[in-house]
């Protein structure tokens, strides 16, 4: 039952001090002096006149102002039913009434009737267990009584008032005020008549009267920077063609599969001229590079995916593609966690990219950043006038070194926001895995901090973040069998890839940062001195099976003055390429999955520059073209030899032949699950050819040379073993037989035993 407004109540309402606009606006039934009558109120800022228009007859009834140019009311006689109607208004800037506006009254659709967010939804969200909260909060296209519109919902528990603003209401927060849904902290409103493409924000009025304009934390699309508005988007219009891929993924154990990842920053892989606009979508210019634009998701699908497939990589890993305001952050300072960046196109365009990758047999991994977020005013920071998403105490809630804020993992709704976000990318965009950035920064309360707050037991372990990771990974694998959850964890935190039920964090892969640093230190040395540091090559095998490791040379290793991979290698031009080939050879035969950052496959000299594309012109030169061919050959070898991947995480998959040769040579055997699947690997990390080098082997017969990094086809010197070697009946290295090999300088050799074939009788 409605009520008549006093002058004081009118003033409060037009200044956005009510939390239930449905109690005031729209159709109301009034009881007064024993009589019942209906009325309709409308809040229309900057209106000269407002009319209620009866839909059936077109009759327009002028509404009376309760507040000048803002709040209007029309009363009906007792017993007169309220008609089906819409509103019409003449604005103050249209004195002649030449551009009258018409719209459906949002407040004639009670939220109880809309029923988009139920009590169970609110309960699960406040508990931190609504795994599909993205289907409820944010902007969603719905139809009520045959009227199409958008249901908006946002969590802002400490706000005095929240409104939706956009072009559809001239960015005036008085017109579309939201209703607070009980004690959940959620505000909601259904706005009829708007649809996909509508730009909007939330106007949040704090408890002390300040007003913030915020992008939608659950918005599916945002404007291209520097604009900051959210965009209504329908994620259900794309028709997928990857069902066979998803079914195969669900039936596949990734730890027993070949995984070789090509890490890509979409904005700097390849550019196009601004004078050559894309066939579809808008042209977004690259900052600091005149007359240059980004490729769109659809253009990248046509160029990047065939390139990756040709090179033989199994997956593409994308540096963050969630919306971020600053290109120079590489995507790691996210504002729109549910919005794929508009720099390269629409959500449907990104779906097309992933779909095309799956059809080509390539998985898609995205970098995900739950560890921190930027302080930009339109983002999550101080969202409702309080520290809503972040910890309030800066000793826990701020990364001084990065200038960012830390999520409050102990708050149910914040944890729900993040966990559901990871699930969202799998469900809506069909991604195959996430790589969680900066895990160590989340696990330690004293990470990069001079002042910090210990946990309740006095330790530095971040117990709330630990619980967050366990919940995250449990749900990822529950809903997405065969998926990847990869941790970038740079310390020796135990059990990162162990199951949660035995006390682990639940990831299924972890970057091996120790191996990466050891190998770069080793290969940076003059080759003559490597013999004095064999531990840098062998130490990783002391712990290689304590976790499920991925060996990665990532974007972080080719920036900030570290030089690119070739620049890290000593010696002249030829020796740099030879050392890099030997390193890649060791990487692809060492236990663990593989990741290479873009441009490493052809040996770029310049460091990675986010404002420029790769130095593709280098491929016209033989050394670079042949290095790329070598990487493709390594990928082919990896995928064709089960010994190199089926037991990556098991000690049974590896055996040293000799790890103590002071000449900078190591040799070992990789075993597959099938006892007949095994290969021999010999690495010579010094610039000396060893023509009569003997190693022990377990079987008699012929050993075919599968790979020689010094082959002429890879721009090597051509020294080798003429395709293979026969064994000698000479025990060596505690093995019953041996091979006498010619070891090229700075090389990796891979050999495979050929079982003896029975000789057919001539009779």
From Swiss-Prot:
Reaction catalysis annotation: Transfers a segment of a (1->4)-alpha-D-glucan chain to a primary hydroxy group in a similar glucan chain
InterPro entries associated with the record: A-amylase/branching_C (IPR006048), Branching_enzy (IPR037439), GlgB (IPR006407), GlgB_N (IPR054169), GlgB_N_E_set_prok (IPR044143), Glyco_hydro_13_cat_dom (IPR006047), Glyco_hydro_13_N (IPR004193), Glyco_hydro_b (IPR013780)
Active-site residues from the entry: 437, 488
GO biological process, one term: glycogen biosynthetic process
Keyword Transferase included in the entry's annotation: yes
One Pfam family cited in the UniProt record for this chain: GlgB_N
Cellular-component GO terms for this entry: cytosol
Pathway(s) this gene product operates in, as recorded in its UniProt entry: Glycan biosynthesis; glycogen biosynthesis
Keywords associated with the record: Carbohydrate metabolism, Glycogen biosynthesis, Glycogen metabolism, Glycosyltransferase, Transferase
EC code: 2.4.1.18
Example GO molecular function: cation binding
KW Cytoplasm (keyword) present: no
Primary enzyme class: transferase
NCBIfam families referenced in this protein's UniProt entry, alphabetically: branching_enzym, PRK05402.1, PRK12313.1
Function of the molecule: Catalyzes the formation of the alpha-1,6-glucosidic linkages in glycogen by scission of a 1,4-alpha-linked oligosaccharide from growing alpha-1,4-glucan chains and the subsequent attachment of the oligosaccharide to the alpha-1,6 position.
Family as reported in the entry's similarity comment: Belongs to the glycosyl hydrolase 13 family. GlgB subfamily.
Subunit structure: Monomer.
PANTHER family: 1,4-ALPHA-GLUCAN-BRANCHING ENZYME
Protein name: 1,4-alpha-glucan branching enzyme GlgB
Gene from which this protein is expressed: glgB
């Amino acid at each position: 039952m409605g009520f008549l407004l006093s002058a004081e109540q009118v003033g409060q309402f037009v200044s956005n001090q009510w939390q239930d606009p449905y109690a005031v606006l729209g159709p109301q039934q009034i009881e007064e002096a024993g009589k019942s009558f209906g009325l309709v109120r409308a809040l229309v800022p900057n209106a000269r006149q407002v009319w209620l228009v009866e839909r059936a007859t077109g009759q327009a009834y002028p509404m009376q102002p309760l507040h000048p140019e803002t709040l209007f009311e029309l009363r009906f006689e007792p017993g007169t039913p309220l008609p089906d109607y819409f509103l019409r208004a003449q604005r103050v800037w249209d004195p002649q009434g030449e551009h009258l506006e018409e719209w459906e009254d949002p407040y004639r659709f009670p939220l109880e009737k809309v029923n988009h967010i139920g009590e169970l939804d609110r309960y699960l969200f406040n508990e931190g267990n609504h795994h599909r909260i993205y289907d409820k909060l944010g902007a969603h296209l719905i139809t009520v009584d045959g009227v199409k519109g958008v249901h908006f919902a946002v969590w802002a528990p400490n706000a005095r008032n929240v409104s939706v603003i956009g072009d559809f209401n001239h960015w005036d927060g008085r017109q579309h005020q939201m209703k607070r849904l009980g004690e959940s902290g959620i505000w909601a409103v259904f706005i009829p008549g708007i649809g996909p493409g509508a730009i909007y924000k939330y106007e949040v009025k704090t408890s002390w009267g300040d007003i913030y304009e915020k992008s939608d934390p659950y918005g599916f699309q945002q404007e291209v920077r520097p604009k900051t508005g959210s965009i209504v988007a329908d994620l259900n219009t794309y028709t997928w063609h990857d069902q066979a891929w998803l079914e195969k993924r669900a039936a596949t154990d990734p730890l027993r599969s070949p995984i070789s990842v090509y890490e890509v920053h979409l904005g700097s892989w390849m550019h196009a001229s601004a004078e050559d606009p894309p066939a579809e979508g808008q042209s977004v210019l690259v900052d600091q590079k005149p007359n240059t634009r980004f490729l769109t998701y659809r253009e990248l699908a046509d160029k990047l995916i065939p390139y990756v497939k040709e090179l033989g990589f199994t997956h593409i890993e994308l540096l963050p593609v969630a919306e971020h305001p600053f290109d120079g952050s590489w995507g790691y300072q996210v504002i729109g966690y549910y919005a794929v960046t508009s720099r390269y196109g629409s959500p449907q365009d990104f779906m097309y990219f992933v779909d095309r990758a799956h059809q080509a047999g390539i998985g898609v991994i995205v970098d995900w950043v739950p560890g921190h977020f930027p302080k930009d005013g339109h983002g999550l920071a101080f969202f409702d006038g309080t520290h809503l998403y972040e910890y309030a105490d800066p000793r826990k809630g701020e990364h001084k070194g990065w200038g960012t804020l830390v999520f409050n993992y102990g708050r149910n709704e914040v944890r729900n926001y993040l966990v559901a976000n990871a699930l969202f990318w799998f469900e809506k965009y069909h991604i195959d895995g996430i790589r969680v950035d900066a895990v160590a920064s989340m696990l330690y309360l004293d990470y990069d901090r001079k002042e910090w707050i210990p946990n309740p037991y006095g330790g530095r372990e971040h117990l709330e973040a630990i619980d967050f990771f366990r919940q995250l990974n449990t749900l990822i694998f529950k809903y997405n069998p065969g998926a990847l959850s990869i941790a970038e964890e740079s310390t020796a935190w135990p059990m990162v890839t162990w199951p949660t039920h035995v006390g682990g964090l639940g990831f299924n892969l972890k970057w091996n940062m120790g191996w990466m640093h050891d190998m770069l230190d080793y290969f940076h040395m003059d080759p003559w001195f490597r013999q004095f540091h064999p531990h840098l090559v062998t130490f990783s095998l002391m712990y290689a099976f304590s976790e499920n490791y991925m060996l990665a040379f990532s974007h972080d290793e080719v920036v900030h003055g570290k030089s690119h991979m070739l620049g890290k290698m000593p010696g002249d031009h030829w020796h740099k390429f030879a050392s890099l080939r030997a390193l890649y050879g060791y990487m692809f035969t060492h236990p663990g999955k593989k990741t290479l950052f873009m441009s490493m496959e052809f040996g770029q000299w310049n460091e990675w520059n986010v404002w420029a594309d790769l130095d593709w012109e280098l491929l016209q030169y033989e050394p670079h073209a042949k290095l790329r061919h070598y990487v493709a050959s390594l990928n082919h070898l990896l995928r064709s030899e089960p010994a190199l991947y089926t037991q990556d995480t098991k000690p049974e998959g590896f055996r040293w032949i000799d790890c103590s040769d002071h000449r900078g040579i190591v040799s070992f055997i990789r075993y597959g699950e099938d006892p007949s699947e095994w290969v021999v690997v010999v690495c010579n990390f010094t610039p000396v050819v060893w023509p009569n080098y003997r190693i022990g082997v377990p079987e008699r017969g012929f050993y075919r040379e599968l790979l020689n990094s010094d082959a002429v086809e890879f721009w090597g010197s051509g020294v080798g073993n003429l395709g293979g070697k026969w064994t000698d009946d000479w025990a060596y290295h505690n093995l019953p037989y041996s091979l006498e090999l010619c070891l090229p300088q700075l090389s990796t050799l891979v050999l495979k035993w050929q079982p003896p074939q029975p000789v057919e009788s001539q009779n």
